[in-house]
């Protein structure tokens, strides 16, 4: 037991030692990285300070050069660029050698450095010990939007140190992998040799000079970002259209391939095309949607409402939304307006309602008969109720009177009406459906109802017009007369003559037994009938 416990203790101690060693190594690496960063920052600071001490006398010249390079004054920058281009092509077309030009340039630099204190005295302030921040360098005379001398020195120092680091890595790679380094070096030199064979060296030098002159302008005004912002929608649209065309071509190619595979042999009859039963074939008609492409396509579309949708939305006609179906809001109002009756209909209904209230009294008041009635009297009362219902149906403005075209409204059961009897049907103007017809064209009963209180009428006077009852067949002579003289308006004399010719003389209808005779019509009733006849005469053409 003790030995096993000692073994476990030893294993636990080993694992703890490994964990501690790993932590110490990690901490050591972090400490080493921090020390390297601190050393690099210190080296950048020392190099920037040394450069600033050398360039502090050229501060005004550097600021003017920056203004020319960023085209702060376009006219001055244009003149400078034209001068440099002319000088370059003049030197390139001369017979002087490049080494001679390089030696002349170095001689000019040394002479300027030697004669600088005499011709360009130092008028700048005494330098501080070390510019540690950008705010200290901002007050050195440069513009806020341009680089000051300390900032320029710091950028130059960082660039130089970065170049040194890459050079050290390249030398280390050469020592570790000499064969790969030789192969890559030979490939790079071959590319440069081919480029120099097809492109002259003067052109390459001119491209380098233009890059040096135009690069500050591009960086300062952010021309690349602006150009990319303007071209991004066009590029996305082009990419999306090319993707759609490629998908369409691929789909057509697959369809032709499937048709070629499913083509019948040479001797067989061609089969009719049927629906695809394979899920793979059906999937070809519904391509997979790329989320990124869809998002880019939606980004270039206009999310605002069109002019037509905006006008409809402002007028309140539709409730327009992008993700819903447009809903009508005026249809309900139109239906409500259609359901409301018009003013002529309301006036006519009001007049007819008042006439019905006056005319349609109780059967007891109309008949004024004793309480004990005979069987025939009860039948007469039932006929009066039927006549009242028929009158209610005829009083509706939308009711169609089928007896108007069935023989000029002849009475039923062979009962003949005398010429002087009141008309028992509505006039043609009232039946024609014209709601604007005057009330004088209605039947005499309706005119009596509108004129005020009337004397009670017996059921025999009320019209007996069943709605759907068939009319008796007329004689052959009567059918010929109706066929030849259909829809012809006649005056009272012609009507009496026609009735006499047809054998419809003035005969009184048979009176039922044990029934009181109807009261004679008064002067008011005859005058109303006469006025109705005069109205018919005025309507005649």
Curated annotation (Swiss-Prot):
Biased composition regions of type Acidic residues, renumbered to the chain: 270-280, 476-494
Chief subcellular location: endoplasmic reticulum
Protein name from the UniProt record: Reticulophagy regulator 2
InterPro entries membership: ER_autophagy_membrane_reg (IPR052114), RETR2_RHD (IPR055257)
Gene name linked to the record: Retreg2
Superkingdom per UniProt: Eukaryota
Domain comment as written in the entry: The LIR motif interacts with ATG8 family proteins.
Molecular functions per Gene Ontology: endoplasmic reticulum-autophagosome adaptor activity
Location(s), subcellular: Endoplasmic reticulum membrane
Residues carrying Phosphoserine: 276, 278, 286, 306, 332, 339, 342
């Amino acid at each position: 037991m003790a030995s096993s416990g000692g073994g476990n203790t030893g294993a636990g101690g080993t694992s703890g030692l490994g964990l501690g060693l790993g932590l110490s190594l990690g901490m050591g690496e972090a400490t080493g990285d921090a020390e390297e960063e601190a050393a690099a920052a210190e080296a950048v600071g020392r190099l920037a300070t040394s450069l600033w001490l050398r360039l502090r006398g050229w501060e005004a010249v550097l600021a003017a050069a920056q203004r020319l390079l960023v085209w702060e004054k376009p006219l001055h920058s244009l003149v400078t660029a034209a001068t440099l281009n002319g000088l370059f092509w003049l030197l390139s077309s001369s017979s002087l050698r490049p080494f001679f030009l390089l030696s002349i340039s170095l001689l000019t630099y040394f002479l300027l450095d030697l004669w600088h204190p005499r011709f360009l005295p130092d008028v700048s302030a005494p330098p501080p010990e070390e510019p540690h921040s950008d705010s200290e360098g901002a007050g050195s005379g440069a513009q806020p939007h341009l680089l000051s001398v300390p900032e320029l020195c710091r950028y130059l120092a960082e660039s130089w140190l970065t170049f040194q680091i890459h050079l050290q890595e390249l030398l280390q790679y050469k020592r570790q992998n000499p064969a790969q380094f030789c192969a890559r070096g030979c490939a790079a030199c071959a590319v440069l040799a081919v480029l120099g064979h097809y492109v002259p060296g003067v052109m390459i030098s001119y491209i380098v000079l233009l890059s040096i002159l135009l690069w500050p302008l591009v960086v300062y005004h952010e021309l690349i970002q602006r150009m990319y912002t303007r071209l991004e929608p066009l590029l996305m649209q082009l990419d999306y259209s090319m993707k759609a065309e490629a998908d369409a071509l691929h789909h057509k190619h697959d369809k032709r391939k499937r048709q070629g595979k499913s083509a019948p042999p040479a001797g067989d009859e061609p089969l009719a095309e049927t629906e695809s039963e394979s899920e793979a074939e059906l999937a070809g008609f519904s391509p997979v949607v790329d989320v990124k492409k869809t998002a880019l396509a939606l980004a270039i579309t206009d999310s605002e409402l069109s002019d037509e949708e905006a006008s409809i939305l402002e007028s309140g006609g539709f409730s327009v939304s992008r993700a819903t179906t447009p809903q009508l809001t005026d249809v309900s109002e139109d239906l409500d307006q259609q359901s409301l009756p018009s003013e002529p209909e309301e006036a006519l209904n009001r007049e007819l309602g008042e006439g019905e209230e006056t005319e349609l009294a109780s059967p007891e008041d109309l008949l004024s008969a004793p309480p004990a009635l005979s069987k025939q009297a009860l039948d007469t009362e039932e006929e009066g109720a039927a006549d009242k219902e028929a009158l209610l149906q005829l009083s509706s403005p939308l009711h169609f009177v089928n007896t108007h075209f069935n023989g000029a409204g002849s009475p039923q059961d062979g009962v003949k009406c005398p010429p002087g009897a009141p008309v028992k049907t509505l006039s043609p103007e009232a039946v024609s459906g014209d709601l604007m017809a005057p009330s004088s064209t209605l039947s005499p009963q309706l005119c009596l109802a509108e004129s005020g209180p009337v004397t009670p009428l017996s059921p025999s006077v009320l019209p007996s017009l069943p709605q759907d009852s068939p009319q008796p067949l007329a004689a052959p002579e009567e059918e010929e007369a109706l066929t030849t003289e259909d829809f012809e308006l006649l005056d009272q004399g012609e009507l009496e003559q026609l009735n006499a010719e047809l054998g419809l003389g003035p005969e009184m209808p048979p009176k039922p037994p044990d029934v009181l005779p109807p009261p004679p019509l008064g002067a008011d009733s005859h005058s109303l009938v006469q006025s109705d006849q005069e109205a018919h005469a005025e309507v005649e053409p």
